[in-house]
Amino acid sequence: PELPEVETVRRGLAEHLVGRTIRKVEVLHPRAARRHVGGDLDLIGRLRNKSVTGVRRRGKYLWLDVADARDRAAVVVHLGMSGQMLIARAGAPDHTHLRIRASLDDGNELRFVDQRTFGGWHVDDYVEPEDTVAQSLSLIHI
């Protein structure tokens, strides 16, 4: 997906994810978590029982801000060429190319579907959002 499509995905995810808690994560294809330094089991552990506090976009990457009482982090998602982030009811039939499933506290699931497996998820340190408006105003004289 190109940048406008990634922004559309971000907006849709924000409506469904902010305020939700991730109860369980399943990595169904190892390539989907290949960029996570600790491997898929570490990714699962880092996300369990985390609340989604924000959904941001940095270039073509989606950043799902997550936190609990001890830790703040971000799920960094790259959609690759064919990746999709879908919201589905728990128990709905799985898509053929389902790679990661995150069960949410409201009975829905966040599903990462990627036919070509070029995309993926990794957990990274939380980074404060940049104040792009202030930056733009400071550069206006140029």
Regions found by a protein language model. Give the residues of each.
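Extended, highly charged segments
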Residues: 1-58, 63-65, 69-72, 101-103
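Phosphate/anion-contacting hairpin/loop surfaces
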Residues: 71-140
